[in-house]
Amino acid sequence: MSGTSPTPSNVVLVGKKPVMNYVLAALTLLNQGVPEIIIKARGRAISKAVDTVEIVRNRFLPDKIEIRAIGVGSQVVTSQDGRQSRVSTIEISIKKKA
């Protein structure tokens, strides 16, 4: 993802690492007092993003997290050989309950 703008401090980008790495990142942000965080993923990592939110919501902070919004979409990605393909994306916004 070179050439993109820097990610905001309340965003967790889900990729190829184990799910617990992203769970820890989300919990760290929530414990630092960030009011709302966004979990973003695309392609095959979408299921990891959903797993991340569910683990935070059910195992670590039960009854303390609410899902604010879920956005799905697609991006056009150009491969190294010049072909374009669409990749699905997801953004899940969560926050601590008041």
From Swiss-Prot:
Modified residues (N6-acetyllysine): K16
GO CC term, one of those recorded: cytoplasm
MF terms in GO: double-stranded DNA binding; RNA binding
PTM entry text: Acetylated. Acetylation at Lys-16 decreases DNA-binding affinity.
SUPFAM superfamilies: AlbA-like
Gene3D superfamilies referenced in this protein's UniProt entry, alphabetically: Alba-like domain (3.30.110.20)
InterPro entries: Alba-like_dom_sf (IPR036882), DNA/RNA-bd_Alba (IPR013795), DNA/RNA-bd_Alba-like (IPR002775)
Cell compartments where the protein resides: Cytoplasm; Chromosome
Transmembrane annotation, as ranges: none
Predominant location: cytoplasm
Biological process per Gene Ontology, one example term: chromosome condensation
Keywords, comma-separated and alphabetical: Acetylation, Chromosome, Cytoplasm, DNA condensation, DNA-binding
Function: Binds double-stranded DNA tightly but without sequence specificity. Involved in DNA compaction.
Family assignment from sequence similarity: Belongs to the histone-like Alba family.
Protein name from the UniProt record: DNA/RNA-binding protein Alba
